[in-house]
């Protein structure tokens, strides 16, 4: 059903290409997963390009849980342990311990502080001591192979940033409705029109990578 709804935004391949261009130009994109999975829409931004204003938008219209999607290589560079040793979450969402920039922030909660934390974490020469633990940014570990291995928003964020020629690090936040419920396909389309953010699905990305 979602593929029919999203056909107004082009073919699956076209939707991915439009999203990649948006990320290259510093805009966010909206990614919906499968209807039989979480059936949620996430805002995704390239970590290296996300602005304070975009972070404020994500905090205001999202769940408030700001996640930084990282590769295993980056997780090891920052020496971030996983949040739990035995992951029992339904979709094996791979949180590490939460983080905060060690310098340049106050409480760590503001949009500006969270951007500082993200920029600190993705620096080429970042070291573990650059970050305090815990904090107000939630790193997520992407699985090797991206969406071809796991059809999650975490993997979509890494795949999209890599395909866009950017650092493999993305920021995501689930989109919520005004009543606090999760935004589904029709609400995501309305949000897209309101905030000029292209829409695609994880299935689109799978099709793009499988060509």
Curated annotation (Swiss-Prot):
Its cofactor is Mg(2+); Mn(2+). Mg(2+) 2 binds at residues 38, 153. Its EC number is 4.1.99.12. GO terms for molecular function: 3,4-dihydroxy-2-butanone-4-phosphate synthase activity; magnesium ion binding; manganese ion binding. SUPFAM superfamilies: YrdC/RibB. GO terms for cellular component: cytosol. Mg(2+) 1 binds at residue 38. InterPro entries: DHBP_synth_RibB-like_a/b_dom (IPR017945), DHBP_synthase_RibB (IPR000422). Binds 2 divalent metal cations per subunit. Magnesium or manganese. D-ribulose 5-phosphate binds at residues 37-38, 42, 150-154, 174. It is an enzyme of class 4 (lyase). Pathway: Cofactor biosynthesis; riboflavin biosynthesis; 2-hydroxy-3-oxobutyl phosphate from D-ribulose 5-phosphate: step 1/1. The record marks 136, 174 as: Essential for catalytic activity. It catalyses: D-ribulose 5-phosphate = (2S)-2-hydroxy-3-oxobutyl phosphate + formate + H(+). GO terms for biological process: riboflavin biosynthetic process. Keywords: Lyase, Magnesium, Manganese, Metal-binding, Riboflavin biosynthesis. Belongs to the DHBP synthase family. Homodimer. Catalyzes the conversion of D-ribulose 5-phosphate to formate and 3,4-dihydroxy-2-butanone 4-phosphate. This is 3,4-dihydroxy-2-butanone 4-phosphate synthase. It comes from Baumannia cicadellinicola subsp. Homalodisca coagulata.
